[in-house]
UniProtKB/Swiss-Prot annotation:
This is ATP-dependent Clp protease ATP-binding subunit ClpX. Component of the ClpX-ClpP complex. Forms a hexameric ring that, in the presence of ATP, binds to fourteen ClpP subunits assembled into a disk-like structure with a central cavity, resembling the structure of eukaryotic proteasomes. GO terms for biological process: cell division; proteolysis involved in protein catabolic process. The gene is clpX. Keywords: ATP-binding, Chaperone, Metal-binding, Nucleotide-binding, Zinc. Residues 1-50 form the ClpX-type ZB domain. Zn(2+) binds at residues 9, 12, 31, 34. It comes from Chlamydia trachomatis serovar L2 (strain ATCC VR-902B / DSM 19102 / 434/Bu).
Length: 419
């Protein structure tokens, strides 16, 4: 085995030649040195796996503060541009979900239904960001999973229950907190079909994953292996009740608009052309989605039936992409401006340049995700040179910098300022 191919400890980086033992796990390794180190830490503090195994929250009813839908949306607005309908819908769903938990903790006679959410929309439209922002607002454990990595029992891949393990880890193994957490599952549409073409024929293993997810989404007491991986006899488990975990799933559902149009008796001629009219028509159709459309797409009825909130995230407009660049609390332009300010250099973006960046992102068809890549490629060389050049006072990004690959305008300091 060459040095390049030597297995190394995932924690300390020692290779298998530098340690006595190297234990392999799912895509990770741990050496005997790190095991001894962890053992010493665990001897001083109770190990999560040996703590009392709880299956329900023991917090008092007053410990759970429930924000109003308007408060939730106002916080989301600070980070997510556009998607007004989606933000309102999800704010109400989250509000009702946590009212439900509080009612259960207070032993009220009337119980509320669970408000799991299905987000439809193209890549980069803000589905994942909405879920991440919710987790920050509500101060609850949050984890993201990719549906394409999940497999049903008996297949090689990640068990569905490992999603709950990741939520438990995000809660520092506090079972009560994990049972009030949020799980976001992305690419959910990819487990409903076998090809990129719309078909009513479902992939057998994909349907199996939907069945496995259905169990934890509708609520069950899951036996979670503390270390992950496949279950085996004589293994210790942590019991987690998933009944009050909020599940949000998202997917692009490509060509779902054609299924809806067929049901409504409309034509989709010209939808392959990415014109503003075509995008608007597609968004209007997705806003009319019904359960039967998702079933035709390839999702099983029982799975879709667990999501009483189905909402469409519309494709971002040019103006919204520009707003994303500059307006949110963590806007990308603000981040880069701050980085250059630390070098005492002012970074200036002309308005036309911002629109050119937004247009370039729109052409990439990955929504807001393309914005960061465009700016990184644009500013990488400058970030390399500027720390070693005390003569630069400001950098101006013009439209030609984006559209014609012209260098940014470098404004030098006056000789007096340098001296």
């Amino acid at each position: 085995m060459t040095k390049k191919n030597l297995a190394v400890c995932s924690f300390c980086g020692r290779s298998e030649k530098d340690v006595e033992k190297l234990i392999a796990g799912p895509s990770v390794y741990i050496c005997d040195y790190c095991i001894k180190l962890c053992s010493g830490i665990l001897d001083k503090t109770p190990a999560p796996a040996t703590q009392e195994i709880a299956t329900s929250s023991t917090s008092s009813p007053t410990s759970l503060r429930v924000l109003t839908p308007k408060e939730i949306k106002r916080h989301i607005d600070s980070y997510v541009i556009g998607q007004e309908r989606a933000k309102k819908t999800i704010s109400v769903a989250v509000y009702n979900h946590y009212k439900r938990i509080r009612a259960l903790m207070q032993d009220k006679q009337v119980s509320y239904g669970k408000s799991n959410v299905l987000l439809l929309g193209p890549t980069g439209s803000g589905k994942t960001l909405i879920a991440k922002t919710l987790a920050k607002i509500l101060d609850v454990p949050f984890t993201i999973a990719d549906a394409t990595t999940l497999t049903e029992a008996g297949y090689v891949g990640e068990d569905v229950e490992n999603i709950v393990l990741r939520l438990l880890q995000a809660a520092d193994y506090d079972v009560a907190r994990a049972e009030r957490g949020i799980i976001y599952i992305d690419e959910i549409d990819k487990i409903g079909r076998t090809t990129a073409n719309v078909s009513i024929t479902r992939d057998v293993s994909g349907e199996g994953v939907q069945q496995a997810l259905l169990k934890i989404i509708e609520g069950t007491v899951a036996n979670i292996p503390p270390k992950g991986g496949r279950k085996h006899p004589n293994q210790e488990y942590i019991r987690v009740n998933t009944e009050n975990i909020l599940f949000i799933v998202g997917g692009a559902f490509v060509n779902l608009d054609k299924i809806i149009a067929k049901r409504l008796g409309r034509t989709t001629i010209g939808f392959s052309e990415e014109t503003d009219l075509a995008v608007t028509n597609r968004d209007h159709l997705l806003a009319k989605v019904e359960t039967e459309d998702l079933i035709t797409f390839g999702m099983i009825p029982e799975f879709i039936g667990r999501f009483n909130c189905i909402v469409n995230c519309e494709e971002l407009t040019l103006d919204e992409l520009v707003e994303i660049l500059t307006e949110p609390a963590n806007a990308i332009v603000k981040q880069y401006t701050e980085l250059f300010e630390e070098e005492n250099v002012k970074l200036i973006f002309e308005k036309e340049a911002l629109y050119a960046i937004a247009q370039k992102a729109k052409q990439a068809k990955t929504g807001a995700r393309a914005l960061g890549m465009i700016l990184e490629n644009l500013l990488r060389d400058l970030m390399f040179e500027i720390p070693s050049d005390p003569t630069v006072e400001a950098i101006r990004i013009e439209e030609d910098t984006i559209t014609q690959n012209k260098p940014p305008v470098i404004i030098q300091k006056s000789p007096e300022a340098i001296a």
